Amino acid sequence: MGRANTIMTPLSPLRLTRDLLAFNTINPPGQEEDCARHLGRLLEAAGFSVAYHAFEPTRTSVIATIGGKQEKPPICFTGHIDIVPLGAAKWSKDPFAGETDGDRLYGRGSTDMKSGIAAFIFAALNLAPHLKNSPGLTLVLTASEELGCEGAKYLAGEKLLDRAGAIVVAEPTANLPYIGHKGLLWVEIETKGKTAHASMPEQGENALLKMNQIVSRIDNFDWKHHCGTDCHHVMGKPTMNIATFNSGLNTNSVPDAARVTVDMRTVPGIDHVHLCRSLETLIGPLGTMRKIIETPPLYSEPDEWIESVFDAAQAFTGQRPPPSTIMFSTDGADLQRGYGGGVPTVILGPGEPSLAHQTDEWCSVGKIEVSVEMFERVIREWNGI
C-alpha cells in the first residue's frame, strides 16, 4: 500500500500522527526517506536546522536542531520512522488510513511509534519560537530501528551526533517513564558434518550430535563466571534462550549441517565482546558462531533531571511508578553511546506497549494529546522558558 489520501485540516497531534501513518515504512524494506523528508520540511519551516543521513539509499534518518548556543547542551528527543510488517492475520481497519473509533487511532505504527514522534514534533513546533537562544532542542528521527537499530548505529558510528545533555526516547510506555532496558544480542551457531546413508551412520559425521553438545554447554552458561555479573539491581538477571534449531533434510541421511539461533538479554556490566569470546570458547572446534543483531543495555541512575521527568509524568497521568526498566530494546543505547556515553536517558511515549506489533494496532488519542503537554513541560524546564 502507498500513502493514503488525507484531508487537509489544521495541524494537530492527531492529524500529524495520521499523516505519518499514511507513509508505508514497513521494515523490510523500510524506505523511510519520504516520511523523513516530510518531517524535515515541517521542522525547517519552524526554524530548525535539518540534516538527512542515509545508511543506504532511501534508508534516511533526520537530525533537526534549534538553539544550542549556550554552554548547557540541548535536550534530545528521538523516535524511529520504520514499522514492522502487518502479519498474517487480516486487519479490520486500513493500517495506513489513520481511522479512529472513539479514542482509538488505528494503524501500523500508531503505538510503535509514530504517535510518539508526532507528539514530540508537535511540542517542538509549538515551542520553536522560544528556543532559538536557549540551550536547545535536538530531534533525532531514525531509520531501521526494528531490525537492529541500523539508523542509530550509523549516526553514532559516523560521529554525526553533536551534543546532548539528556535524551527522551518516545517509545510506547503509556506515558509512564522508564530508565532503561536490557541489551540484546542474537547469534547463529553452525556445525558441519559429513552426510551418509542413515543405515551406515559410521561413514558420516553427524552435525546434529555436535550441536547437541554445544546446546548443552550453552544451556548451563554461568553468567557470573564468564561475564563477572549475573544480576542488576533494577533489571534483574540476564537471560539466554535457544530460539531456533534446524538440521537435516531427510530422515534416512546423516545430517551434515545444523544451525541454532540464540537470543541473549544482557544487563549493565556485561561486555558483549567478552560475552561472544566466552561463547566461542565454549563452542570450541565443534562449530562456528556469527553475530546477527546487537544492542547494548541502557540504564540511567535517577538524577535531578530524571526525577523532573517523573514529576511531569505524574502531573499529567496521576501515576508515579518506581524507577524501572522496559522489556524491549530501543535506539536509546546506541544514541547514548553516540553522544559520548553517560547521557541520562528516559523512555517515555504515548503508545501502549502491549499493542506494539499487534494486528489492529491502535493508540489512545487522549494519550497522544497528554504526551504533547508532557513533552512541552520537559522541553521548557530544560531550556528555562
Predicted regions and their residues:
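Hydrophobic residues within well-ordered alpha-helices
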Residues: 1-3, 43, 334-339
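Acidic/His- and Gly-rich active-site-bordering loop/insert found
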Residues: 6-108, 129-133, 352
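Metal-dependent amide/peptide-bond hydrolase catalytic core
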Residues: 51, 179, 186-385
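Short acidic loop-to-helix transition motifs that present clustered carboxylates
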Residues: 57-60, 174, 328-331
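Acidic-glycine-rich active-site phosphate/pyrophosphate-binding loop
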Residues: 86-101, 163-164, 179-190, 346
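Fold-level recognition of mixed alpha/beta catalytic cores in primary-metabolism enzymes, strongest
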Residues: 105, 110-111, 115-220, 360-371, ...
